A protein has these predicted regions:
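Beta-strand-loop-alpha-helix segment that lines the small-molecule cofactor/substrate pocket
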Residues: 1-41, 56
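Structured helix-beta-strand junction loops
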Residues: 3, 29-30, 87, 109, ...
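Structural detector of well-ordered beta-strand residues that form the stable sheet scaffold
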Residues: 8, 33-35, 65, 114, ...
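Short aromatic-enriched loop/helix-cap "lid" or pocket-rim segments at secondary-structure transitions
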Residues: 21, 48, 74-80, 125-127, ...
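Predominantly a Rossmann-like dinucleotide-binding segment in NAD(P)-dependent oxidoreductases
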Residues: 40-123
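Contiguous beta-strand/loop segments that form the cofactor/metal-binding neighborhood of enzyme cores
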Residues: 100-176
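Short acidic, glycine-rich loop/turn motifs
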Residues: 134-138, 180-188
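C-terminal helical cap and adjacent loop that interface with cofactors, partners, or active-site loops
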Residues: 190-201
Length: 201
């Protein structure tokens, strides 16, 4: 930014919130962009879910969720930087951030958040388990359930949207598969959408 260039960084944007505000202010002052790469927004399954929301296929949305149940053994946190507040953060900042970004991109701004965090199994500075209740600006609720204390392996990483008009769940290894796609008013395109929007990674 000081060199007059736009900046794209890998997550996280910064480890301390004040640093994000400083970087954004510098970018704004210089008429430059400072942003974080969240590549899951480009996945066909995520794009299909976003399009369904934008086309009002759900009608009134009633619930939106992120579920991440991954396994990180204690050795993962013993390298000196994983799980530290200064260099890494916990499950929210390190693992679930891409899913949370996709959910907010799909469903819009969040008005308020209430969270509870813990170290369920692992010993680290930050959290290995987090539950959050979201209140979206469009007056529906959301839930973030994220943990690296799943055993013995990674089980799930998904985003789902539920509304009066249907239910869609995107999962897979990298938010790359449509797991559920069902609407009250289905179209001929729905089956094709599921097939073309799910890809192997």
């Amino acid at each position: 930014l000081l060199g007059g260039k736009h900046v794209i960084v890998e997550k996280p944007a910064a480890m301390i919130p004040e640093h994000i505000y400083e970087l954004q202010a510098l970018a704004d002052k210089s008429n430059l962009m400072y942003t974080v790469m969240h590549q899951n927004r480009l996945n066909p399954a995520v794009v299909a879910l976003k399009r369904a929301v934008d086309e009002n296929r759900f009608g009134k949305i009633t619930l939106a969720t992120v579920r991440l149940r991954w396994c990180r053994l204690q050795e993962y946190y013993e390298d000196g930087w994983h799980g530290t507040w200064l260099m890494d953060g916990g499950v929210i900042n390190q693992q679930a951030i891409h899913h949370i970004d996709a959910l907010q991109w799909i469903c819009g701004p969040v008005r308020s958040v209430v969270s509870a965090n813990s170290n369920a199994l692992n010993k680290l500075e930050a959290e290995d388990t987090s539950i959050s209740l979201l209140n979206f600006e469009d007056n529906f609720l959301g839930i973030i359930e994220a943990t690296t204390a799943a055993r013995p392996r990674d089980f799930e990483a998904s985003i789902s949207v539920l509304g009066e008009g249907g239910f869609v769940e995107v999962g897979g290894r990298a938010l790359n598969k449509i797991v559920n796609w069902e609407f009250v008013e289905s179209t001929d395109q729905d089956r094709l959408e599921v097939k073309k929007s799910s890809e192997e990674v």
